[in-house]
Amino acid sequence: MSPARTLESSPLPTTQTAIIQGEGGILSIHHNAPLPTLRPDRILVKVAYVAINPCDWKMADRFPTPGCVDGCDFSGTVVALGSDWAKTGRFKIGDRVCGGVHGSNPIDQSTGCFADYVSADAQFTFHVPEYMGMEDAAAVGGTGIGTLGLALKRSLGLPGSPRDPVPESESVQVLVYAASTSVGTLATQLLRMSGHKPIGVCSAKNFDMVKSYGAVKLFDYHSPTCAQDIRAYTKNTLAHILDPITEPKTTELCYAAMGRAGGKYCALEAFAEEFCTRRVVKPELVMGMAILGGRIALDYGYESEADPEKRVFGVSWYEEMQELLDSGRLRNHPVRSFPGGFEGIMKGLHLLKTKQVSGEKLIVQLG
């Protein structure tokens, strides 16, 4: 580890338990893994809870890199400060924090949070407000927040923000596919607080839950007339769509729902070009961890070079999100406590991969 200020009364161990990729990206539990490297710009966090996200199994499945620690969203307690942060006063040892990291990162293999300790970028880590429990804090995490900053502001180009909402005259309708997912309920809140009108697509069984986050209208994707119904409701003028799922059937529905003049389709997964059938619709893939400003060393369209401007935007965005957390305006997704520690994470990953989770965020206690 780099020189850092640590909690002297509790010396850090030399090894930890972590979930790490093996050959072919197969994830397994290791009990003698090294602690993550603490760079000057990072803080070391003793993990209390982790959230399980679809990206956690997808990263290992699609981009197998033996040695990578998996896991993105966490909450925990600061136990060491990188040299850049040791004297700033922004963080101190013992602080309760939450955030998101680029787990299963081929060029930073020790960073994942499915471990006893995680090394987190301090500028993209939140202080947990006093009113919030650590389980809910893990559900907030940071991955979705960063992704939506890039998606709503830079990809869809929406005006306004929760800090500075647009007036009614500038409000636009935004379709959120998979509105009952954690990204969906977060997007719905941010859109509503920014002055816009979030329209959700999800299963009818989750309508009441999504409405409670601010959706103005909901449509059931099971309906054979879902796209036509959306076009009718929006008077054929819909021009902004967010699709966290980005499978062929979701892309088809979103393209069919888009208004006559077209618009922007923001995908959070790589999209198949053959389903992007309308020239007036401009598709774009957003990779959430690009908000950190570093290189994304993946492939299949997810790769990107370092972009310092995204980091500048991201720091400002996270500062605004901290304000929302502190004021209690930002709600986390409904939590489903999942037992079993590291074994529980492995079981939870299987449930997500086999699509057995709906309208809930799986949270596992580690510390």
Swiss-Prot record:
InterPro entries in UniProt: ADH-like_N, GroES-like_sf, NAD(P)-bd_dom_sf, PKS_ER, Trans-enoyl_RdTase-like
Transmembrane intervals: none
Binding site for substrate: 143-150, 288-292
EC class name: oxidoreductase
Subunit structure: Monomer.
Record function comment: Trans-enoyl reductase; part of the gene cluster that mediates the biosynthesis of the cytotoxic leucine-containing cytochalasans, including aspochalasin C, aspochalasin E, TMC-169, flavichalasine F, aspergillin PZ, aspochalasin M and flavichalasine G. The first step in the pathway is catalyzed by the hybrid PKS-NRPS ffsA that utilizes 8 units of malonyl-CoA to iteratively assemble the octaketide chain before addition of L-leucine by the C-terminal NRPS modules. Because ffsA lacks a designated enoylreductase (ER) domain, the required activity is provided the enoyl reductase fssC.
The protein, known as: Trans-enoyl reductase ffsC
